[in-house]
């Protein structure tokens, strides 16, 4: 068209160039907004996509936690079964408590029991382990939904740990800590039932000696069955959590 009008007409058309550019630009811009608007209406909004992503992530998290809990429960069941097959604590015992009253295993039926074997002349390990045991008992006492756990201390040194010595010793830890002692044969029998090793060392010039022995805290359920044990490396918090799980599992299978 410009060629048909000739060069002389071009200056007259120059005044329309801005209008053409502006008009075309506006048209293109409006079309772009129209297309963009159509694209936004066709798909979910940003909030919807974020909500879907959050729900999906929460679902994955819940599934992971459920799988982890199931795996932990399976491990606990396997451990409990292995401990039962070890035949620990299945026999009875006959001892005297720190008040001079006879005690046997049946006296603790219906209670959860934490039991530790040691001796009152122990310089450090026994006091530390008994203090840890008492911490566990106190933490569990602070939870009203949980049953009381009975702490028990059985000596492996009956030669020195008579009733009076046990009474003096246990009062330093917890008012409900029960000390048990007996004759050499009675203590040996109870120790064998729980697979506890102990051996008195040589006496020094003051007739003092150290007793080497197994270091473990035993957990018995209300049926009197050995349920678990905890070595020195286990903290009070770890033991409390383990006992919580055992209590929950025990009550879940009650008729």
Swiss-Prot record:
It is found in: Mitochondrion inner membrane. It is a single-pass membrane protein. Residues 74-248 form the Thioredoxin domain. Residues 68-255 are mitochondrial intermembrane. Residues 42-49 are mitochondrial matrix. The keyword Amino-acid biosynthesis does not apply. GO terms for molecular function: copper chaperone activity; copper ion binding; protein-disulfide reductase activity. Expressed in retina, retinal pigment epithelium, and sclera. One of its GO terms (cellular component) is myofibril. PROSITE patterns: THIOREDOXIN_2. Homodimer. Interacts with COA6. Found in a complex with TMEM177, COX20, COA6, MT-CO2/COX2, COX18 and SCO1. Interacts with TMEM177 in a COX20-dependent manner. Interacts with COX20 in a MT-CO2/COX2- and COX18-dependent manner. Interacts with COX16. Belongs to the SCO1/2 family. This is Protein SCO2 homolog, mitochondrial.
């Amino acid at each position: 068209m410009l060629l048909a009008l000739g060069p002389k007409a071009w200056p007259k058309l120059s005044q329309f160039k801005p209008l053409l550019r502006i008009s075309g630009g506006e048209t293109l811009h409006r079309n772009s907004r129209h297309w963009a608007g159509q694209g936004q209406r066709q798909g979910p909004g940003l909030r919807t996509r974020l909500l879907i992503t959050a729900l999906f992530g929460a679902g994955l998290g819940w599934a992971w936690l459920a799988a982890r809990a199931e795996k932990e429960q399976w491990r606990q069941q396997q451990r409990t079964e292995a401990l039962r097959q070890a035949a620990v604590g299945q026999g009875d015992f006959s001892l005297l408590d720190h008040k001079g009253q006879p005690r046997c295993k049946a006296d603790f039926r219906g209670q959860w029991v934490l039991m530790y074997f040691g001796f009152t002349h122990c310089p450090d390990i026994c006091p530390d382990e008994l203090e840890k045991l008492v911490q566990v008992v106190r933490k569990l006492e602070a939870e009203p939904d949980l049953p009381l756990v009975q702490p028990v201390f059985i000596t492996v040194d009956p030669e020195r740990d008579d009733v009076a010595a046990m009474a003096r010793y246990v009062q330093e830890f917890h008012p409900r800590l029960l000390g048990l002692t007996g004759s050499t044969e009675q203590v040996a029998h109870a120790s064998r039932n729980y697979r506890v090793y102990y051996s008195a060392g040589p006496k020094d010039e003051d007739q003092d000696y150290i007793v080497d022995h197994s270091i473990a805290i035993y957990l018995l359920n209300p049926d009197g069955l050995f349920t678990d044990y905890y070595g020195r490396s286990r903290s009070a918090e770890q033991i409390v959590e383990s006992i919580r799980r055992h209590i929950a599992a025990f009550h879940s299978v009650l008729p």
